[in-house]
Design a protein with these regions (language model features):
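Short, Lys/Arg-rich, polar N-terminal cytosolic tail immediately upstream
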Residues: 1-13
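A structural signal for multi-pass alpha-helical bundles of membrane permease subunits
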Residues: 16-303
Length: 303
């Protein structure tokens, strides 16, 4: 009985500490099992030559050395850089649309619904819609070009244009996502600061730059994080629209990893894991920067 009383008193005394730990434990366990463990396994498998079924052969850093001379790997990295640079256009585009939708004009709810619509579509639907849009003969794009007297173009069949066509498809829903972030942020903008700015003569670009954008910094931060990670993880649109073609010119690291490790081109688990490790390290640089920025902002806010 005394032991039970002592135990209860210990739990009572530490309840404020134990309660958050109790709620955090399931999430931490899932994170360790489904995130940390696969990352460690990828590092380990990248040191082996393994087809996923038979005996694995230790090869050390041979897979990474092979990457240095792999032309397809070079193309994949270059395409990832294109995605990273052009995908960021979703942020200013989303901001401009949000600023427009934040006005009190006739039919604004209809406009909001139209711009919100791409966000609720899955990437599969977006890929199919833009595949039809780019069709060489029946597609809407070439119908418009023909109407205005221009020659038709095969966007997804041209190695020099295909990647840009896929990125344009990805920008459609990503811009809608950034728009939603900024609309939420605009609702939290302090109207007193805007009024004070107007009294000081600020309007237009000056109002946006000096008063509105500083208050939208949290939304901008989230938009950058999600957009950059989305650009580096691009896979589904490529798989649906070109399957890496034409001639492998639309591959990115995530798709090339899939081809080497799991598709009919390879079953080279070790080589695919090496590609995954490189992609993870690239993403880790951005994630570390974002975490440091969050820590720095929180530290400054406490002062």
């Amino acid at each position: 009985m005394s032991t039970l009383v002592t135990q209860r008193s210990w739990i009572q005394r530490n309840r404020m500490t134990l309660t958050p730990l109790l709620f955090l434990t399931p999430g931490v366990l899932f994170f360790v099992v489904y995130v940390i463990s696969p990352i460690i396994q990828s590092f380990n498998i990248s040191l082996y030559d393994w087809d996923g079924m038979g005996q694995a052969t230790y090869v050390g850093l041979a897979n990474y050395e092979e990457l240095l001379d792999d032309r397809a790997f070079e193309i994949s990295i270059w395409n990832n850089l294109k995605w990273l640079a052009l995908y960021l256009l979703a942020i200013p585009l989303g901001l401009m649309i949000a600023l427009f939708l934040n006005q009190n004009v006739v039919g604004i709810r209809i406009y909001k619904s139209l711009f919100f619509f791409p966000f609720v579509l899955s990437q599969v639907v977006v890929g199919l819609v833009f595949s039809w849009f780019y069709l060489p003969r029946e597609g809407l794009l070439n119908a418009v070009l023909t109407f205005f007297g221009f020659d038709t173009i095969n966007v997804l069949g041209d190695p020099s244009m295909a990647t840009y066509g896929i990125i344009a498809a990805g920008l459609w829903p990503q811009t809608a996502y950034c728009m939603i972030l900024y609309l939420t942020g605009l609702n939290a903008v302090d109207p007193e600061q805007i009024e004070a700015g107007r009294l000081d003569g600020a309007k237009g670009v000056r109002m946006l730059w000096h008063i509105i954008l500083p208050q939208l910094r949290p939304a901008t931060f989230i938009a950058f994080v999600v957009t950059i990670i989305g650009a580096l993880r691009s896979f589904d649109l490529i798989s649906i629209m070109t399957n890496g073609g034409p001639f492998g010119q639309t591959r990115v690291l995530s798709f090339y990893m899939f081809e080497k490790a799991l598709s009919e081109y390879g079953f080279r688990m070790g080589y695919g894991s090496a590609i995954a490790v490189v992609l993870f390290l690239i993403m880790l640089v951005f994630i570390a920067y974002f975490l440091w920025s969050m820590y720095r902002d929180e530290r400054e806010a406490r002062r």
